[in-house]
Amino acid sequence: MFNPNPKAFPLADRELTIQILDLIELAKAHNQLKKGANETVKTINKGYAELTIIAVDSDPIEIVLHLPLLCEDKNIPYVFINNKHALGHACGISRSVIACCIPAGVNPTLTDQVKNIRNKIEKFIN
């Protein structure tokens, strides 16, 4: 049984995780996705990130725990999901991915879905 690290908050439930992974696949299809911790950090620091997704099973977890702090500084919603391999698959990569983000100025076909996920994450936090 997987016991997530208590430092990883907010952790998406199964339904929200599926919706997030579907959104990531759509963003990848529209070339609107930044994959990996380094690209995610760069996008957050520039203020371009619309939404950040972090894998809770990153080993060690400390390599991604700075991302929530960066997101909070820039008022960017973030969420942890359970599986880095599923995140990598959704990003279109055969390897695991520990973090990704959807940059601002997304394709108009994704705007409503991004807003919907952002609202769910904000409700999840509060």
For the regions a language model picked out, list residue spans one by one:
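Polybasic, low-complexity intrinsically disordered tails and interdomain linkers
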Residues: 1-48, 104-126
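Short, functional N-terminal and low-complexity linear motifs
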Residues: 5-11, 55, 80-86
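Extracellular/luminal Protease-associated
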Residues: 35, 44, 49-63, 68, ...
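Short basic, glycine-rich beta-strand/loop surfaces that mediate nucleic-acid
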Residues: 64-125
